[in-house]
Amino acid sequence: MKKIVFVLTLMLFSFGTLGQETASGQVGDVSSSTIATEVSEAECGTQSATTQGENDWDWCCELCCNPACFGC
């Protein structure tokens, strides 16, 4: 009986810990993807300012993998 109570208690504590790690991981993923998108947009903006033409936007999309670029 003590083993069963111990196992159940252990399961409850581990479930709470895993839930917190999952929630914090999801929040971190959202913020890191937002930062990556902003950096990609900045790189694409500097590239398009230095050269002109539709091929430049294609190169930008291939390099940045940024869905905000035209044609991606």
Curated annotation (Swiss-Prot):
Toxin which activates the particulate form of guanylate cyclase and increases cyclic GMP levels within the host intestinal epithelial cells. Highly toxic. One of its GO terms (molecular function) is toxin activity. This is Heat-stable enterotoxin C. Belongs to the heat-stable enterotoxin family. It is found in: Secreted. It comes from the Bacteria. The keyword Signal applies. Disulfide bonds join 60-65, 61-69, 64-72. Keywords: Disulfide bond, Enterotoxin, Secreted, Signal, Toxin, Virulence. Residues 1-19 form the signal peptide. GO terms for cellular component: extracellular space. The keyword Signal applies.
